[in-house]
């Protein structure tokens, strides 16, 4: 297991060469928290290395959901009938959304510590990671404003032009469309922003092509942290919770 290998990309080619020599599978696991600079890799690794994008923990993985309903079963058997009851209350779900699926938050010893993980993550992204990803100097305040715009528009089909106006209107922030897209691209490479692509069960339907992506993050707790919400305030804003959950 080699963690954060993207900080030393030569590891990729070294692993590829070693795999060719041994002619065995399942020998190495390379993990990283952001996208590697592909120009530093000599070979794609096709046929030797498979890529898998992972996310934060689901309620089933954190052992909070009873897992009695399977999405796969619902698709495989549309006529299936079931009578199950969630063990989680609305307050439990609100807290889970505010806390997020971060392993450090799930395993935290107190609720206060659990809720601080997402806030710390956002601060690190805005103050450090946004520049470390490719060495380009970026404005931490502008980064935060762009993320806040995403948070306000989470789970909606908000257009880029709409969010750009939102950013510019905040604190007289100056931002052009190319600059906005540069920041968004960097945040996507950091796996912070993860929009949900259009989906339609009718594969050949034009609706799939015409529908835009819904705005989203790798974890709902990021939106909560950016909007300055708490489990208590979220209980008074169930409509907002619906978009976040």
Cite the ranges covered by each PLM segment.
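Glycine-rich, phosphate-binding/catalytic loops in enzymes
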Residues: 16-19, 45-49, 233-234
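Residue-level signal for well-ordered alpha-helical positions
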Residues: 14, 44, 65, 228-229
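Conserved RecA-like P-loop NTPase ATPase core
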Residues: 3, 15, 62, 100, ...
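Structural recognition of the conserved hydrophobic beta-strand(s) that form the central parallel beta-sheet
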Residues: 2, 26-33, 53, 62
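Conserved catalytic/switch belt of AAA+ P-loop NTPases
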Residues: 12-36
């Amino acid at each position: 297991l080699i963690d954060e290998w993207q900080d030393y990309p030569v590891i990729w080619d070294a692993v590829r060469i070693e795999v060719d020599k041994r002619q065995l599978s399942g020998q190495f696991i390379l993990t990283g928290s952001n996208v590697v600079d592909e120009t530093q890799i000599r070979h794609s690794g096709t046929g030797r290395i498979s890529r898998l994008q992972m996310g934060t923990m689901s309620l089933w993985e954190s052992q909070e959901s009873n897992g009695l309903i399977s999405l796969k079963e619902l698709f495989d058997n549309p006529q299936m009938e079931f009578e199950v009851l969630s063990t989680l209350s609305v307050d439990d779900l609100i807290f889970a959304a505010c806390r997020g699926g971060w392993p450090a938050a799930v395993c935290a010893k107190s609720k206060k510590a659990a809720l601080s993980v997402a806030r710390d993550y956002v601060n690190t992204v805005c103050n450090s990671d946004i520049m470390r990803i490719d060495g380009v100097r970026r404005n931490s305040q502008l980064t935060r404003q762009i993320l806040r715009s995403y948070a306000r528009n989470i789970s909606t089909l908000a257009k880029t032009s709409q969010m750009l106006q939102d950013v510019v209107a905040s604190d007289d922030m100056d931002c052009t469309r190319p600059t906005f897209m540069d920041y968004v691209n960097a945040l996507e490479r950091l796996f912070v922003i993860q929009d949900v692509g259009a989906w339609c069960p009718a594969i050949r339907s034009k609706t799939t092509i015409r529908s835009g992506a819904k705005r989203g993050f790798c974890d709902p707790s990021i939106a909560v942290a950016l909007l300055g919400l708490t489990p208590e305030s979220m209980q008074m804003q169930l409509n907002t919770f619906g978009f976040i959950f």
